[in-house]
């Protein structure tokens, strides 16, 4: 049980997919202008990443390995992720039309979020069992959501700040992301496996 908790903490804080592995940078930079949008995107990504990890494990274990079709892994995982994203899009559209409108194009773009595919492929490469796969996906999603919301809050503060002209826009956003990455390096050594 403790190992599972440490896996989630390690994946969310120490080996954060955005700040350490540089996966999921497109939504990180694109959706992080308002905290409300970042929270919605974080919740949708958490749902998709967790389900994608579960589905990828099941597809790998019960379809690809028995059929000796591991060479189709990437293609099949992309199809599975696309189905899960469509399901998520329908759920968000029905439950929160405002959030659906705010997320706009970024919701269907979860399909091409490299963090989602990266987690699914890393689960296979790390030979995680079912529970570890789901927790790894959940931890990655929690880390992604945490960083997304924190970055959105910082960008809202920066929008009201007097930033020098050469640093306005993407420049200050990248500098802020770099400082966040340095801050998250402080978690290194928190979990010893």
Swiss-Prot record:
Membrane topology value: Multi-pass membrane protein
Domain of life: Bacteria
Keyword field: Cell inner membrane, Cell membrane, Electron transport, Membrane, Translocase, Transmembrane, Transmembrane helix, Transport
First-level EC class: translocase
Major place of residence: membrane
Originating gene: rnfA
GO biological process, one term: electron transport chain
Record-listed E.C. numbers: 7.-.-.-
Subunit text: The complex is composed of six subunits: RnfA, RnfB, RnfC, RnfD, RnfE and RnfG.
Organism: Haemophilus ducreyi (strain 35000HP / ATCC 700724)
Entry's localization field: Cell inner membrane
A single cellular component GO annotation: plasma membrane
Transmembrane regions: 5-25, 39-59, 62-82, 102-122, 134-154, 171-191
Entry similarity comment: Belongs to the NqrDE/RnfAE family.
Protein name according to UniProt: Ion-translocating oxidoreductase complex subunit A
Biological role stated in the UniProt entry: Part of a membrane-bound complex that couples electron transfer with translocation of ions across the membrane.
InterPro entries in UniProt: Ion_transpt_RnfA/RsxA, NqrDE/RnfAE, NqrDE/RnfAE_oxidrdctase
Keyword NAD listed: no
